[in-house]
Design a protein with these regions (language model features):
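Nucleotide-activated sugar donor-binding and catalytic core shared by glycosyltransferases
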Residues: 2, 11-22, 37-50, 192-193, ...
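Generic beta-sheet signal
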Residues: 54-56, 71-74, 143, 164-169, ...
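Conserved nucleotide-sugar donor-binding subdomain of glycosyltransferases
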Residues: 85-151, 198-242, 246-247
Length: 289
């Protein structure tokens, strides 16, 4: 008599496997960011999970279990526009002292506040989103970039599902503190800078100044103002967005230390560099001389 393999016996005791209900919240108007998350959303849906994505850029040819709530038309999508004046017109003194680079670095980040606040002011009254947030989910995925508005709205509607941050690049300067990670500017270059390790003394000095500046800027130019937008719309106080952010369960960053350098991380921040890549094999076209 042949023995019954153990895994066949184990199957008898396995209960039905249920798909997860996943809500994705992506309020940023940059298409390149959404392109980093789409392969993950597609794969989750292909594996049978119930995926609902709130985004400006719904999937084309979505799989069966994927549903999109489009934000298109809610605000202007600036897919191909950039203000080049922030890189022009610097005087000789700024160029000679290197202050022109600092000025440009600061200026190119400032529009992120306008994008975030404009979108947040419209999301608070966006009925399709409020209807979604009244339902129950197993996990909520949301982008961590220039806004905490979705975090606040999830709290307003009493969401209890664990929240997972997604980042299309190395974690932003203001994101690490909420996980208890110290990004020492003496050897951790800003994600948006041109610096690599090791840095010179002047580069470390510039890196430190901008690190402090951007954390303060995000707090006062975006986070507190988004909180005010939410509180004024719903007519009640909510928990500080910074405190809410400390309860996020996990952060997946589309980066890898082989390219971005070694950084101090914790188990709650996981590098998933290359998550945006299409693994489909395609023949390489012949190149003639």
């Amino acid at each position: 008599m042949r023995a019954v393999p153990f895994h066949y016996i184990l199957l008898v005791f396995i209960k039905d496997v249920l798909p997860a209900r996943i809500l994705g919240l992506f309020p940023h108007i940059g298409k390149s960011h959404q392109m980093a998350y789409d392969p993950l959303l597609r794969r989750l849906a292909e594996r049978g999970h119930d995926v609902t994505a709130v985004t400006f850029f719904p999937l084309k040819n979505p799989p069966e279990h994927y549903r999109a709530v489009s934000l298109e038309g809610l605000t202007e999508i600036r897919v191909e526009s950039i203000n080049m004046s922030i890189y022009e017109g610097h005087n000789v003194f700024l160029r000679l002292t290197g202050l022109d680079r600092i000025r440009s670095h600061i200026s190119e980040n400032h529009p992120l506040a306008d994008f975030a606040l404009d979108t947040c002011s419209k999301l608070v009254s966006f009925k399709p989103l409020s209807e979604l947030l009244k339902k129950e989910y197993d996990v909520i995925l949301t982008e961590n970039f220039n806004s905490d508005c979705m975090l606040g709205l999830a709290n307003v509607y009493g969401q209890k599902a664990p929240i997972v941050y997604l980042s299309s690049c190395t974690a932003m300067y203001w994101a690490l503190d909420r996980f208890g990670v110290t990004d020492n500017p003496s050897y951790v270059p800003l994600v948006s800078s041109i610096f690599t390790t090791p840095m010179t003394f002047l580069q470390r000095l510039e890196n430190a100044v901008l690190n402090v500046y951007f954390k303060v800027w995000f707090r006062y130019a975006i986070q507190l103002r988004e909180q005010k937008i939410i509180e004024e719309h719903f007519g009640r106080k909510i928990l500080d967005l910074q405190e809410m952010a400390k309860n996020v369960s996990l952060m997946l960053v589309n980066a890898h230390h082989s390219l971005n350098g070694v950084r101090p991380l914790i188990p709650g921040i996981v590098e998933v560099g290359g998550m945006h890549l299409d693994k489909t094999r395609r023949p390489i076209s012949q190149v003639s001389e």
